[in-house]
């Protein structure tokens, strides 16, 4: 695998750290007036999802992580695994709860997801940026109730709970940003 010098470190670069793939989220290159230059890096381990900071000397290097991001279609959940299919090869992959994590609440049938593979096994699943889900439970909105500028909690068809405006009712389909978990709009 490729080896990266500290000068090559950029946000989004995937490297091996302690035998586990990690992605660089922030990188700051520091050249002090006296002494050797170094890179202060913030990383997120892809398997354990831990955030950590590490300092690399300018002479250090890191091995590139052999991970692949591929687009797969979400099929179904059998209770233990979430199943995805490659639309080109029709090959199916099963991701466990550790790989899916909190994103399980945004997975809907036939959604295009980005799945990160390491050693041909899924280690991370990223749902589409926006999903359209039906509201299955929320408090009824009262006409003229504009005293609070906030919203009300609504339970969606996948079990996720988001804050929605007061005018949104049960049975309506809304668009949700999966990155922040916030209401975006009603779907016409």
UniProtKB/Swiss-Prot annotation:
Keywords: Cytoplasm, Elongation factor, Hydroxylation, Protein biosynthesis. It comes from the Bacteria. The modification N6-(3,6-diaminohexanoyl)-5-hydroxylysine is found at residue 34. Transmembrane segments: none annotated. It holds the Pfam family Elong-fact-P_C. InterPro entries: Elong-fact-P_C, NA-bd_OB-fold, Rib_uL2_dom2, Transl_elong_fac_P/YeiP, Transl_elong_KOW-like, Transl_elong_P/YeiP_cen, Transl_elong_P/YeiP_CS, Transl_elongation_fac_P. GO terms for biological process: peptide biosynthetic process. SMART domains: EFP, Elong-fact-P_C. The keyword Cytoplasm applies. It is found in: Cytoplasm. GO terms for cellular component: cytoplasm. One of its GO terms (molecular function) is translation elongation factor activity. May be beta-lysylated on the epsilon-amino group of Lys-34 by the combined action of EpmA and EpmB, and then hydroxylated on the C5 position of the same residue by EpmC (if this protein is present). Lysylation is critical for the stimulatory effect of EF-P on peptide-bond formation. The lysylation moiety may extend toward the peptidyltransferase center and stabilize the terminal 3-CCA end of the tRNA. Hydroxylation of the C5 position on Lys-34 may allow additional potential stabilizing hydrogen-bond interactions with the P-tRNA. The keyword Metal-binding does not apply. Coiled coil: none annotated. Belongs to the elongation factor P family. Involved in peptide bond synthesis. Alleviates ribosome stalling that occurs when 3 or more consecutive Pro residues or the sequence PPG is present in a protein, possibly by augmenting the peptidyl transferase activity of the ribosome. Modification of Lys-34 is required for alleviation. This is Elongation factor P. It comes from Proteus mirabilis (strain HI4320). The gene is efp.
